[in-house]
Curated annotation (Swiss-Prot):
GO terms for molecular function: oxidoreductase activity, acting on the CH-OH group of donors, NAD or NADP as acceptor. The gene is yeiQ. It comes from Escherichia coli (strain K12). PROSITE patterns: MANNITOL_DHGENASE. The keyword Repeat does not apply. This is Uncharacterized oxidoreductase YeiQ. Belongs to the mannitol dehydrogenase family. UxuB subfamily. SUPFAM superfamilies: 6-phosphogluconate dehydrogenase C-terminal domain-like, NAD(P)-binding Rossmann-fold domains. InterPro entries: 6-PGluconate_DH-like_C_sf (IPR008927), 6PGD_dom2 (IPR013328), Mannitol_DH (IPR000669), Mannitol_DH/Oxidoreductase (IPR050988), Mannitol_DH_C (IPR013118), Mannitol_DH_CS (IPR023027), Mannitol_DH_N (IPR013131), NAD(P)-bd_dom_sf (IPR036291).
């Protein structure tokens, strides 16, 4: 069967210009998902195209992804990224992946040993918030998580990311090998501290001495990642195959924009990512806040209210004058004033975001962005609301966004159609929705302390604002509620 590794590709396709034989598995990456393929791996590929070198990536997937890994091997670890701009496309073959391992195809033992090879300098992760096994209420390791329970009972055969990292670091220490940097690339706040808490929490349970060694010798840099990467669909794979003249089951489509801000704290070296435009900084937090509130906050706002209004894609929302105006107003009037970042033109940043959201070539589903809202709301909307509450400034669009989430998870859109709600707390949410009338819905959902904390549900101003926004949506529908809030 022909693959991208076995055919002559069209001239417009950008193929690797470096010697892939020189690559070693110096980066081991957990989670060969769409985002990683279009972001960290692609940026590493750019560095290799610019200056060569041996910074190859070994991709790891544990208990799923075996079919994708088999397909990747069949095409010599090459895959395609299609960058879709409003003005045209770029087709890129990424060659930075050197090998891949999967627990089903290979073995857990082989995976753990891979982390222990001397050349491994960085272990990076895109495993989503759930993969870190952290208790969201405390930020500490969740010792009630079934995988963590398993790993503490059988530490040499771990099933969780924290368990595998600790076992690998333990073995490296025993063998006299240098430790590696642990680099979280997930779109979660303070991701360096999240993975550090998970690893140290697991290590403390196993050996306080080992935990002390990890604390002293391993670094956990923070990162801010930004690129819109919709999930692959049959349609997107067919479109890419038309560019290539051959099928690539590992291919992914994305927008042209890409940004990666990384805390420059690596214990065993790193690729020269700055050559690929990566911003290496001392403190990621201001950048992270800017992105989470201005981009992700407005994305979630558009996802809930847009879906309720019958818009399937973010770009569809942006064709609507009210939604476009609301997104920009939310960014600049309600989110920007809460930020600490200096020397960034936030108006220019907002205008770029609006243009990215409006990109008609990207079919980014409102339903996809609406997933896992209980984990996203705290940093995307509630953090900004807390600042406004303290200052007594206006946050009426943020209130509408929170009420939009409540209406969305209630399971019916404005046309009366059922919504397929995907959320880690979906069982709990379903129970609260079923047990409350429309008038009681806000109070019922505010009882989710893991989302709203203890402070907001006890704040009468907050509760009143959300109830008013809820009533607007229930009475008039999401689109008219938006117009009423904007007073247009």
């Amino acid at each position: 069967m022909n693959t991208i590794a076995s055919v002559t590709l069209p001239h417009h396709v950008h193929a690797p210009r470096y010697d892939r034989q020189q690559l070693q598995s110096r980066i081991v990456h957990f989670g060969f998902g769409a985002f990683h393929r279009a972001h960290q791996a692609l940026l590493t590929d750019r560095v290799l195209n610019a200056q060569g070198g041996d910074w190859g990536i070994c991709e790891i997937s544990l208990f799923s992804g075996d079919q994708l890994m088999s397909q990747l091997r069949a095409q010599n670890h090459l895959y395609t990224v299609l960058e879709k701009g409003a003005d045209g496309n770029q087709v890129i073959i990424v060659g930075a992946v050197h090998e891949c391992l999967n627990a089903k195809l290979d073995s857990l033992a082989a995976i753990i040993e891979k982390f222990c090879e001397p050349q491994v300098a960085i272990v990076s992760l895109t495993i989503t918030e759930k993969g870190y096994c952290i208790d969201p209420a405390t930020g500490a390791l969740d010792t009630s998580n079934p995988r963590i329970i398993h790993d503490l009972q059988t530490p040499e055969e771990p099933h969780s990311a924290p368990g595998i990292l600790v076992e690998a670091l333990k073995r490296r220490r025993e063998r006299g090998l240098t430790p590696f940097t642990v680099l979280s690339c997930d779109n979660i706040p303070d991701n360096g501290h999240v993975v550090k808490n998970a690893v140290l929490g697991m290590a403390e349970k196993r050996s306080p001495e080992l935990a002390g060694w990890i604390k002293e010798h391993v670094s956990f840099p923070g990162t801010m990642v930004d690129r819109i990467v919709p999930a692959a669909t049959d349609e997107s794979l067919v479109e890419i195959s038309q560019h290539l003249g051959v099928n690539d089951p590992c291919a992914i489509s994305c927008e042209p924009f890409i940004q990666w801000v990384v805390e420059d704290n690596f214990v065993a070296g790193r690729p020269a990512w700055e050559v690929a435009g990566v911003q290496m900084v001392n403190d990621v937090l201001p950048w992270e806040e800017m992105k989470l509130r201005m981009l992700n906050g407005s994305h979630s706002f558009l996802a809930y209210l847009g879906y309720l209004s019958g818009f399937a894609h973010i770009s569809d929302c942006m064709q609507d004058r009210a939604f476009r105006h609301a997104a920009r107003t939310l960014m600049l009037d309600e989110q920007a004033p809460t930020l600490q970042i200096k020397d960034v033109d936030l108006t220019q940043y907002a205008d770029k975001l609006i243009a990215r959201f409006a990109n008609p070539a990207l079919k980014h589903k409102t339903w996809q962005i609406a997933m896992d809202g209980s984990q996203k709301l705290p940093q995307r909307m509630l953090a900004g609301i807390r600042i406004h509450q303290g200052r007594e400034t206006d946050w009426s669009l943020l209130a509408l966004g929170v009420a939009g989430w409540m209406r969305y998870v209630s399971g019916v859109d404005d046309a009366g159609n059922a919504i397929d709600v995907r959320d880690p707390l979906s069982d709990k949410i379903r129970e609260l929705v079923a047990g409350s009338s429309s008038e009681q819905r806000v109070t019922a959902l505010l009882s989710l302390r893991e989302v709203f904390g203890d402070d907001l549900p006890d704040n009468p101003h907050f509760v009143q604002a959300i109830e008013q926004a809820w009533q607007q949506i229930v009475q008039f529908g999401a689109h008219q509620a938006l117009l009423n809030t904007l007073k247009i």
